[in-house]
Amino acid sequence: MSEPKNYVLVTAAYNEEAHIGRTIESIAGQTLLPQRWVIVSDCSTDRTDEIIRRYLAKYPFIRLVRIEEKHARNFGAQVMAIHRGFEQLSEVDYEFIANVDSDLSFEPTYYSKLLQKFEEDPKLGLAGGFIFEQGHDGVFRSRVLNTEKSIGHAVQMVRRECYEAIGGWVAMPYGGQDWVALVTAQMHGWRIKAFSDLPVYHHRPTGGGDRRFRNLFREGRMDYSVGSYPPFEILKLVRRFVFPPYLLGSFVRLWGFLWGYWHFERRPVSREFVQFLRREQKSALRKIFLHGKTKESLPDSSSLYPEPVRADEFPSAKPPANHNA
């Protein structure tokens, strides 16, 4: 039997008093603990820091870093906070590094099983589980984006050699750092995969109303910023007509996508990145039109888990009694 692999975790947290305790308990309950977990409190103004400090003596692998400098709150800032956490890892021996959002929980064997996947495939460079999102009704449902080729930034684990080859996570103003990491890893010859047998529970209820439309507009700008191929983008949005907010949501995201063209926005990725991404998307389109393989070809496929699951079916999805104490 091979020796357990060393891994480290980094979390960027901002005003997460409602969730951070649950996430810490879930990580601390893993059958294989991380060598170090750096939690970066990014200018939090609530009790996030206080809650984290309560766990420091009990779990010596946790480190707390606080950012005091005020700055704009966007997806790029989140990645910069994660980079601040990396500064605490320079003297730690590890083979894998993972981002963990501060509102997640896991099964106790999540990381040991995920590392086993890496052990079985030496060319697997980036991987993670399938994300289940909690709605306002308390029900966890598989997110629409769950496919084997879509690993959300919230749970991305990267082999160290792969991480160094791709230059880590890149700060993207409209999000998409997970997408950039996935594509760049493949550009360097690494395999990527999300595993449906490794559920991850996201406890923050998904937004609605105006916030949902703002997010869709931002996602359209994100699609432009990474250089998505326009025909691919249009087909992807047509397929999303059937998901709330029906029809209108696709038009809002398309508006965001076209906004970048209208304003001649510069993309924060290289020309080589855009060329590689568009080759992959054109290949996906050919598969669709020649073979009709939409689920396997498009990155945001419909849910592979049609039946919702409830939090009480999974012990790791329950918040500890004292996490808000």
Roles of regions detected by a PLM:
Residues 25-34:
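Short, acidic, metal-binding catalytic loop of nucleotide-sugar glycosyltransferases
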Residues 41-50:
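A conserved acidic beta->alpha catalytic loop
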Residues 79-96:
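Active-site nucleotide-sugar/metal-binding loop of Leloir-type enzymes
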Residues 93-105:
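Short beta-strand-to-loop acidic/aromatic patch adjacent to the donor-nucleotide binding site
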Residues 105-142:
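Conserved donor NDP-sugar-binding/catalytic core segment of glycosyltransferases
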Residues 139-158, 218-223:
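A recurrent flexible, glycine/aromatic-enriched loop bordering the glycosyltransferase active site
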Residues 174-181:
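Acidic donor-binding loop at a coil-to-helix junction in glycosyltransferase catalytic cores
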Residues 214-314:
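Non-catalytic, C-terminal membrane-associated alpha-helical segments of glycosyltransferases
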